[in-house]
Amino acid sequence: MVRTPLSPEQVAAGRRLGAALRAARGARTLEDVARGAGISPETLRKIETGRLPSPAFGTIVGLSDVLDLPLETLAEVWRPVSAAAS
């Protein structure tokens, strides 16, 4: 299956998502949060740094659960800045 390249807006959204997840992680270790979400620490590292700007929905659900962040909050972070402002 061929993936369509992400638009610059989607890449920027991925960076915002990663930054929000990193902030929510706080003092918790990357390893502990990754384990709780059922993903590898490397996957979480890539998401937090924006190198994986479009993670799987199940990954986001797991991170939402372990970080006690509502999915709606993460969706707001992901939405384009112009859409969030309207």
Task: Identify the meaning behind each predicted range.
Residues 1-27, 72:
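A short, Lys/Arg-rich alpha-helix, primarily the initiator
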Residues 2-3, 75-86:
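Short, charged recognition helix plus adjacent turn
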Residues 19, 23, 46, 65, ...:
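DNA-binding alpha-helical recognition surfaces that contact promoter or target DNA
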Residues 26-46:
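Short alpha-helical DNA-recognition segment
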Residues 27-29, 55-58:
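Residue-level signal for the short linker/turn that defines the boundary of a DNA-recognition helix
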